[in-house]
Amino acid sequence: VKTDEGEFVGYNTDGLGFIRSLGVTDQSNKILMLGAGGAARGIIFAFKQLGYKNLSVANRTLENAKKLVDELQFGQAITYLEAEEQLQSFDVVVQTTPLGMKSNSKELPIQLKGIKEYTIVADIVYNPLVTPFLEEAEKYNVRTINGLGMLVHQGALAFSYWNGSYPNTDDMIQRLTEQLGG
């Protein structure tokens, strides 16, 4: 939140922070979002704002995915089973559920068998740096991205809103990776 011409303006930097960490600018990429919570909402909204066209939301509870898609007027809701069946068609898979955090089990939202070799698999969890989901993805020789970049870029975006300049995020990511044991 900052003031702009005497008015308070709020920004959600989650989505844009995630997309900056992803480093993907091809708007024709087909995106699979796993989870339909607050973080997914911010990321989906950012994909929509940036002109992406192909996004599917899979959630444990299909109704929650449908509700999110309807509210944002973007994407399509699918089941986890449909996500697994269509896995070959996605270019980017984004895991936004709390699965994989230190206190949770090794449970995966979907199985990754059959994933394309050049797919990007991201998990917004940053502690641990390598979640069970990313560990599974690495077995298929895909590019994996943990949530640390999202954390850093959303903070950098907030900093830029307040100060007018975007800080060097490479150093931040390196230092945080070292702090988290990576």
Question: What is each of the regions a protein language model found here?
Answer:
Residues Q76-T144:
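Rossmann-like adenosine-cofactor binding region
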Residues M33-L34, V57, D123:
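Hydrophobic Val/Ile/Leu positions in short beta-strands of Rossmann-like dinucleotide-binding domains
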Residues L50-L72:
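NAD(P)-binding Rossmann-fold cofactor-contacting core
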Residues L22, S28-K48:
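Glycine-rich adenosine-cofactor-binding loop
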Residues V1-V24, V130:
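Phosphate/diphosphate ligand-binding glycine-rich loop within oxidoreductases
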Residues K2-T3, E117-T169, R175:
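Rossmann-fold NAD(P)-binding glycine/threonine-rich loop
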Residues Q27-K30, Y52, E117-Y118:
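Phosphate-coordination loops involved in phosphoryl transfer and adenosine-cofactor binding
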Residues R20-V24, F45-Q49, D70, E135, ...:
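Short, well-ordered alpha-helices that flank and scaffold nucleotide-derived cofactor binding pockets
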